[in-house]
Amino acid sequence: MVNPDAIGWIDVPGTRIDHVVVASPPGYPDWYLSHDFQGRRSFVGCPYLDAACGNSLSDMPGCFIVYGHNLGPIDSGMFGDFENYRDEDWRSDRLRGTLRTPAGDIVLEFFAAETVDASRTGIEDLGISMNDLEGSMAAIAARCGFKELQKSKQNATHATYVGSQAADDACGIEGGPSACADGHAGEPHAEDSLFVFCTCSYTTWSNERTLVYARGHMKEAPDGASS
């Protein structure tokens, strides 16, 4: 049986995060907190989109908060590994993921993480402005952005000033050669969506959540590919 609530599939290489994402049925915003993908009551639940964010992952640019359980050693594709994103060494080669949707693949670029009280996980609680996503992402990066990305940005900026201006100009963007190669170099852009992945964690408070932030943009089709 196909579940009409399915809206995407998240996959983060190098982690156990590999699971379907759903939208909760109307009137039951936390249904998948205690029900699996088949609709059966289960402590495992299923990763689901915050009802305040709508019922699609493809209405971009936008803000999308996705919740998933942390099941520890038996995580089975859920969100437990997001708790590890506070560790610089662990996350260093796990900064990208893919969110597959009916509209196409969304490239995820993780750029920040923080631990908050469980009561502070909504859009307004996190100080996210739907009218200024670019500014919101910049504020998040300043508050809890990954240090290695900030260092990379500083190095790229320095390279620009010591001899890479020509390559930068050829791209028509700021940020140096690394920005040229990808078009996204740790900086928020107007076309990006903000994704927030939320899971339980157990470090500071008795009821806390780890939030991992990612910029997301639709993957461009290869040259010559049909749309």
Language-model segments: residues:
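Solvent-exposed, non-transmembrane regions of membrane-associated and secreted proteins
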Residues: M1-S227
